[in-house]
């Protein structure tokens, strides 16, 4: 994992990593889900088959607390709405968008500012895309297994703190036995804290290993 913090008048933070499988993508999205707040925008970019829908599905299922939730691609409906415990999430696919006028008609960015927006093909949004956001760029990892992906996460504006915290969380988990554990989001309390149960399956007579992960932003 590589980090590249950027200092400017507008805060930004970026880091990159390689993921070896869909399960690894799901773990990354579960960790990101722990940090999201109302009003966040996540932009998923990459070519056809890069893994945008896989990321979106994993993130939504984690936020919903339902690992088998049906998450259809909004390629034709353009926007799919999910009323989640923490906020409403709008999952948009802008592949078929061809003009700024169509973006305006979607009302994707003009509705409740507390909504979280998860956007595939964000480059079709043009200048309508908010500056405060989390960009996730996916690409095939050259010369490796077909399921392997390179992922670059960049936070700009208010998104910079989320991405920097995610980078710190991954470094922390990589120092523990739970880096590859299954993440299960737990109901939070009235504070800004969020929680996940980490589970490593046991083998034979060895029971599962579990731990509680708490995100407590200052």
Task: Write out the residue ranges for each language-model feature.
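Conserved lysine of the Walker
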Residues: 52
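Short hydrophobic/aromatic beta-strand immediately N-terminal to the Walker A/P-loop
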Residues: 41-43
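Conserved nucleotide-sensing/catalytic segment adjacent to the nucleotide-binding pocket
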Residues: 66, 71, 75, 79-123
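P-loop (Walker A) phosphate-binding loop of NTP-binding proteins
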Residues: 45-47
């Amino acid at each position: 994992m590589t980090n590249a913090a950027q200092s400017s008048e507008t805060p930004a933070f970026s880091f990159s990593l390689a993921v070896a499988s869909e399960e690894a993508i799901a773990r990354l999205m579960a960790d990101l889900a722990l940090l999201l707040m109302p009003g966040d925008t996540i932009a998923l970019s990459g070519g056809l088959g890069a893994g945008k829908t896989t990321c979106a599905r994993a993130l939504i299922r984690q936020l919903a607390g339902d690992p088998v939730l049906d998450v259809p691609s909004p390629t034709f409906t353009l926007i799919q709405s999910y009323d989640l415990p923490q906020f409403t999430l709008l999952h948009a696919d802008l592949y078929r968008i061809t003009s700024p006028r169509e973006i305006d008609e979607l009302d994707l960015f003009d509705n409740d500012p507390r909504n979280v927006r998860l956007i595939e093909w964000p480059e079709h949004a043009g200048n309508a895309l908010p500056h405060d956001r989390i960009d996730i760029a996916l690409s095939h990892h050259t010369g490796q297994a077909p399921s392997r992906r390179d992922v670059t996460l960049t936070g700009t504006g208010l998104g910079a703190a989320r991405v920097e915290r995610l980078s710190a969380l991954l470094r922390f988990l990589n120092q523990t036995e739970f880096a590859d554990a299954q993440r299960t989001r737990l109901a939070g309390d009235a504070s800004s804290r969020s929680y996940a149960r980490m589970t490593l399956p046991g083998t034979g007579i060895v029971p599962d290993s579990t731990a509680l992960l708490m995100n407590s932003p200052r």
